[in-house]
Regions:
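Bacterial N-terminal signal peptides
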Residues: 11-20
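Lumenal/extracellular ectodomains and adaptor appendage modules
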Residues: 26-349
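Active-site rim recognition segments
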Residues: 453-579
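Cytoplasmic C-terminal tails of single-pass
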Residues: 606-619
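Active-site neighborhood of thiol-dependent amide/isopeptide-bond enzymes
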Residues: 380-467, 471-473, 488-499, 503-506, ...
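Acidic low-complexity segments
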Residues: 296-421
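Alpha-helical transmembrane segments
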Residues: 590-606
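Bacterial N-terminal signal peptides that target proteins for export
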Residues: 1-9
Length: 619
């Protein structure tokens, strides 16, 4: 997944003509000032915002005027990674609310040109009046859109348009020598009921007036950077997991296994959503079917569960529950994860724990000469850990191009080296490259997988997202998402996502099957997860946790063996185990019969002996 707002640029094009009112005289200072003032106004609880763009053309030099000819063209952007259908639906919503007025509130004629999906809409407004030093020219364009709002429960992320890199703020006409100043003011307006501010980018100034909060962003800071405000410090998600387990046994009929299910049983091991300290992620279970035979925590902290299901028919594992995540308010946040490189390497050098997060793999080619060279260049002359992370982040964004076609088709992993050489890349390659660079620099890191860019409605075919985690002493695992192509780097607490599992190697899945049947290839086909934000109140105290499904009342670590679970799995999912299960009852019956016969034989012998003894006494 990439930054869906990266290309949301409000381009401004002016087509008009300039005429001198008398003889041309070189002006002192600016001759013309053109202001483009954009406000994105959001009301708490809505899932849309109102965008108001006020275009003002002022003639400061009375020697000149603009005639009532030419036109002004506004650009209303699309979100480029939306589907064509989504773009068309959103365009209809925008156009139905579109108004174009003059300064007095009167409607102005305009025309619409819809471009191909992803290229936006052009609104052309003919110049309706002459512009002089005594009479400025105003256009007020307004429309509603969902594009700038990401709402999940009480969490709201408002993202505004950036300015193109080629934006100019002043221009001198070569023929007339006149100077034009261009101002691009941008403000986000929210009401007093908005949740607590958690994050903001870039720098802003804030004003409060009449129950509203105004966040203003400097125009130079907006070049290539989308302003972003995150309101809300907690989010609750609901998740549904459904895994259709395939039939693998075509030999034993159901009528026999229904009497003795161990005759045809597969044991599935799957990962469940985990807990995570950085965002205080907690998991609450509403239902699990069937009840897991065992739940444990692996060395990375992932939660794994064992389920027994019939092997001779299709069946299902179904789990529903909730996941809560939290982040600090903007006042409470601090970059406690940052430290000098000297201190950082000094603290981790004697740790045995981080060794497995520094080695190379098939897809993290840290010993490749090209990757080593790039990693060395990026870390050279850097002073702090954050400096290195930011350098790596920018490098990955500059080198890789997100491939939307790969994201929506079969996703073949290519590894860091091939991605750097121009191979098709999605979030997996962005993470692989950054992990390779970090490990080559001696910075322990691992892959994180979960679900990101979440909404209140789960999309069809929801796919997993991959990002990076970096080990930092006294902080723990620090999350970084290099797929988010922006100078506003995704780092630290992120509540627009949930973490499912992590890996210190090339693995991307914890799904395993233990079976006595020959299974050539186990795929994730039939494994479906939906995660979406919750707006209703949920009493989490009435729900269960993983420990409620264990015999001991605690989730054990993988280093603590569960002998009964191991023996049960071995007996039910191996040929030898099944042989034991089938022959053991027969063996026990035979042993029992032999014991009974032996016991009866002994009794008969004793009875005969007693009779013989009595007969001898009578004599």
């Amino acid at each position: 997944m990439k930054n869906r707002f990266k290309n949301a640029l409000l381009s401004i094009i002016m087509l008009s003509f300039l005429f001198p009112s008398t003889s041309v005289v070189n002006a002192q200072g600016e001759d013309f000032v053109i202001d483009t003032n954009t406000e994105v106004t959001y009301s708490t609880g809505d899932d849309f915002a109102t965008v108001t763009t006020e275009y003002i053309r002022n003639v400061e030099n009375s020697e000149y005027y603009f005639p009532a000819t030419g036109e002004k063209i506004f650009h209303i952007p699309d979100i480029t990674d939306n589907s064509q259908e989504e773009i068309q639906v959103e365009r209809k919503y925008k156009l139905e609310s579109l108004t174009v007025k003059d300064f007095t509130g009167n409607d102005i004629d305009y025309s619409i040109e819809e471009n191909e999906a992803g290229e936006g809409i052009y609104v052309t407004v003919p110049n309706y009046k002459t512009t002089t030093s005594n009479s400025a020219y105003h256009i007020v364009l307004e429309y509603k859109t969902h594009d700038y709002i990401l709402k999940i429960g009480d969490f709201v992320n408002i993202i505004g348009p950036s300015l193109p890199e080629e934006t100019i703020f002043e221009k001198t006409d070569e023929e007339s020598g006149t100077l034009t100043i261009f101002n691009y003011n941008f403000t986000v307006v929210v009401d007093e009921d908005i949740p607590t501010l958690a994050k903001a980018y870039p720098k802003y100034t804030k004003m409060e007036e009449n129950g509203r909060q105004y966040f203003e962003f400097n125009q130079t800071d907006r070049i290539g950077n989308s302003p972003s405000l995150e309101f809300g410090t907690s989010v609750l998600y609901r998740f549904n997991l459904e895994y259709t387990t395939p039939q693998t046994d075509n030999f034993i009929p159901e009528k026999y296994s229904s009497l003795f299910n161990a005759l045809s049983t597969n044991v599935y091991e799957i990962s469940l959503p985990r807990e995570f300290a950085e965002t205080n992620q907690r998991v609450y279970i509403e239902s699990i079917s069937p009840t897991p035979k065992d739940i444990y925590r692996d060395e990375e902290g992932n939660i794994l569960a064992l389920f027994e299901l019939p092997a001779n028919k299709d069946d299902k594992i179904e789990i529903t529950g909730y996941i809560s995540v939290e982040q600090d308010s903007i006042e409470e946040q601090s970059k406690t994860f940052d430290m000098s490189l000297e201190d950082y390497f000094g603290e981790i050098k004697n740790s045995d724990y981080i060794g497995r997060y520094l080695s190379g793999t098939e897809y993290w080619e840290i010993n490749d000469e090209y990757i080593k060279q790039e990693a060395d260049t990026l870390i050279k002359d850097q002073g702090t850990l954050l400096d290195v992370i930011e350098a790596n982040y920018k490098y990955v964004n500059d080198k890789l191009e997100y491939d939307q076609n790969k994201a929506t088709s079969e996703n073949t992993r290519i590894g860091a080296k091939e991605a750097l050489l121009g191979g098709p890349s999605v979030c997996m390659e962005y993470a692989d490259v950054m992990i390779s660079l970090l490990r080559a620099q001696g910075i322990p890191s691992r892959a994180a997988l979960g679900y990101a860019n979440l909404r209140e409605i789960a999309p069809d075919n929801q796919v997993r997202h991959q990002w990076v985690q970096i080990w930092v002493p006294d902080y723990g695992w620090l999350s970084v998402d290099p797929t988010f192509e922006s100078a506003n780097i995704k780092i630290g607490q992120m509540v627009d996502r949930i973490l499912w599992e992590v890996f210190n190697d090339d693995s991307l899945s914890n799904i395993k099957i233990y079976s006595a049947n020959d299974i050539v290839d186990l795929t994730t086909e039939g494994f479906v997860v939906n995660v979406f934000g919750v707006t209703d109140e949920v009493d989490l105290e009435t729900l269960k946790t993983y420990s409620d499904y264990t015999a001991s009342g605690e989730v054990r670590d993988s280093q603590e063996p569960n002998i009964s679970s191991f023996v049960g799995t071995a007996l039910k999912t191996t040929t030898l185990g099944k042989a034991v299960l089938v022959t053991l009852p027969i063996f026990l019956v035979l042993v029992t019969l032999i014991a009974i016969i032996s016991f009866v034989s002994i009794l008969i012998k004793r009875q005969k002996r007693k009779k013989k003894e009595k007969s001898q006494i009578k004599r």
